[in-house]
């Protein structure tokens, strides 16, 4: 519940900043990167296995968000906006490590770490395929 509240707080912060800059939110659209990540793990299996798979995907999405926010925070000339992204980066890093910790807690660590590496390899292929298309997570 705490994570959900924190994420909603982030959404509000981003939305407020968008409005402050004179923009509006666009329509929600499907994220090809996320859809392709979800194709990696097979359907079925135990509830625990499916949960571990979802935790790994969520962890990867958070890790990539963290990387993007770090780059933005380091390159932006607007110090206020740079700090905004740095704060989000720290939070995303905590989420990423939390999801991996939970996956390792509920699944066999050796198997989870193997699946994590395989997911990273799969993601590299997704990134080659998607190229530099506009997206949130990809």
Where are these regions (language model features)?
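Non-heme di-metal
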Residues: 1-138
